[in-house]
Amino acid sequence: MMPQSGVAQPPMAPMSMDQHQYQQQAPPPTQQQQWMMPPQQPQQPQFQPQSQPAWAQQPSQQQYGAMATTNPNPSPTGNPNEVRSLWIGDLQYWMDENYLSTCFYHTGELVSAKVIRNKQTGQSEGYGFLEFRSHAAAETILQTYNGTLMPNVEQNFRMNWASLGAGERRDDSAEHTIFVGDLAADVTDYILQETFKSVYSSVRGAKVVTDRITGRSKGYGFVKFADESEQLRAMTEMNGVLCSTRPMRIGPAANKKPVGTPQKATYQNPQATQGESDPNNTTIFVGGLDPTVAEEHLRQVFSPYGELVHVKIVAGKRCGFVQFGTRASAEQALSSLNGTQLGGQSIRLSWGRSPSSKQTDQTQWGGSGGAYYGYGQGYEAYGYAPPAQDPNMYYGNYPGYANYQQPQQ
C-alpha cells in the first residue's frame, strides 16, 4: 500500500489502446485461482510507463477545464498562520490557472492557483501564487520542482516562498551575473546552465530571455555565480566558446548585492518614455559616470552587446550617450548594464532621445545635457514582475547591484 503522507510522484502515462484492449480481453481466472486470490477492492486503472509522463504533455483547453473540475481542491490543514503559499515566476502569456493546476494536480496538495494579471489589459504579468494544504507540502513542492523542467515547454520552474515566515531561510548572499549573447535559437535555460556548470561549480542558475508573446528566445541570457572569481574567469574563458551551434559573446551584467545593501533612489528621465516607445531608437543615455571614465572605456564596456555607431561623453556633466546599430543590441545593453560599476561609480541607463525626434539633439550629443540628469526606472526587458512582487529571486528588475568593473585595457 502506498503511504498517504508526502507529495505524490507524477502519474504514469495512460496505456495505449492496444494495451487497454488486451487487458479487457484477458481470460478470467480459473476457479482454483479465484479461491487462492484474496478479495480485491476496486482499483484505479493501471498505467503503463512511456518515454514522456502524462504530466509533461500539453493538455488541450478542454482538458484544462476538466482537470480543474474533476480534482476538487483539498482543504488547508495545520496551523492557519503558517506559510503555505509559493510564488511562481517566468510564466508565459498562455500559462493560466488551469495550466498551473495540471502541473501539480497529481500531488493532491494544491488548494488554489492564481496568475496575476494587469488590471487594464487583463494580460498575465508573468507570475502567480500557489497555495498548498500545509507548510510541509509547500516546502516539499518547492524542493522537488524548483529548477526542474516545466510540462511541455523548454524552461524550468522558478519558484520561491510567497512570503517568509518562521522556518524559511532566504539567500541573502551576493550573486555575480554575466551576460551571454549570440545564443542559438535552440538554447534553453538548462542547456545554458549546464554549459557553464560543467566548468564552474558555483553556477547557481541560468536564464534565456524570451519574448513574452511568442515564447521564442531573444538570443541572449544570463548566468549567475555564487563565486565572484569564477564569474570573472568566465568573462574571459567562455567568450567565444560554443553553446549548441554558435560561439557565445560574454559581457558584464548587473549583480545582486547582499540583502541590506542600501539602494539608490531612482529618477525618471523625461526622455525615457519617448525613447522606449520608438522602435527605431538605438540610443542609450548613461548617467552617473565617474569623472575618470573616458569614451574609449565606455566603448569597451558596451561593445560586447553589438555594433556601436557613436559614443559620446558630455564634458563636465558626468553623463554620455551610446548609440548602437540595432535596437536589439541597445535593449540587451540597457537591460544588462544598468547598475554596473565603472570607475567606482554605478552607471544609470535609460533610453536616450530618439534620432527620429523632431526636437534638436544638440543637448544630447554636445550641449548641456541637463535634461538627462535623471534616469529611468529599471528596464523590464524580461517582462517580469516588479521587485516588490518578486520575493528574493534573481533576474529581471533587480536594482542597484553591481560589483563587476570592466578592466582597463
Curated annotation (Swiss-Prot):
GO terms for cellular component: cytosol; nucleus. CDD domains: RRM1_SECp43_like, RRM2_SECp43_like. It comes from the Eukaryota. Residues 84-164, 176-255, 282-354 form the RRM domain. GO terms for molecular function: mRNA binding; poly(A) binding. Constitutively expressed in leaves, roots, and stems. Residues 263-280 have a biased composition (Polar residues). Residues 19-81 have a biased composition (Low complexity). The keyword Repeat applies. The keyword rRNA processing does not apply. GO terms for biological process: mRNA processing. It is found in: Nucleus. Residues 1-83, 251-280 are annotated as: Disordered. Keywords: mRNA processing, Nucleus, Repeat, RNA-binding. Its main location: nucleus. Pfam families: RRM_1. Belongs to the polyadenylate-binding RBP45 family. Interacts with the poly(A) tail of mRNA in nucleus. Heterogeneous nuclear ribonucleoprotein (hnRNP)-protein binding the poly(A) tail of mRNA and probably involved in some steps of pre-mRNA maturation. This is Polyadenylate-binding protein RBP45. It comes from Nicotiana plumbaginifolia.
